[in-house]
Amino acid sequence: MQRSECPAESTKNAFLFSCYTGLLKGEVQDLRWDAIRLSGSGLVLTRPVENSDEVVRVPIVEPAREILQTAEREYANLPQEQRDDKVFHLFSSMTLNEHIKKWAKNANIDKNVNFMTSRHTFATMALRAGIDLYVLARWCGLNNVASAEVYADLIRRDYHSNSEMLEAAFSV
């Protein structure tokens, strides 16, 4: 999808940023520049943990940093009266999801793609990279690992499906 045309560049950047950080749509819509900090390990994003006063730090990977640089340039070009410290200036939720559906269609994706797909992408990529389920749950702002188990189940089903494909490839 990344290389396909999207009806709005802001939608594309916000969706991809969520793919790289695991933020929910509302969190991306409300994300402010003061939630992004420089730490010893690079840029991090601070986010609340559900049903808690805690805050967790999520590392910002290079592709997400590039999106932030683009957003920062766009922010700097806004007239002073339009600056509200939000990182992304997005359309309504309905329009946002319409853009995502059109974008998926442009990418020849037949599945139901919506903003939540970006969080699923983040979680499955993190687990495939070997990130611990507990760490993933924290990065996603979840206060228990059980809530993140759904992503591990997706990986297990994917593994089973790939195992069958491998078996079929080697059967004579």
Features from the language model and the residues they span:
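Short basic/aromatic active-site micro-motif
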Residues: 10-12, 90-94, 110-129
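Short, polar N-cap/turn motifs at the start of nucleic acid-interacting alpha helices
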Residues: 35-42, 110-112, 131-151
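Catalytic-site neighborhood detector that most strongly recognizes the C-terminal catalytic loop/helix
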Residues: 49-53, 93, 140-165
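DNA/chromatin major-groove-contacting recognition/catalytic segments
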Residues: 3, 56-59, 66, 70, ...
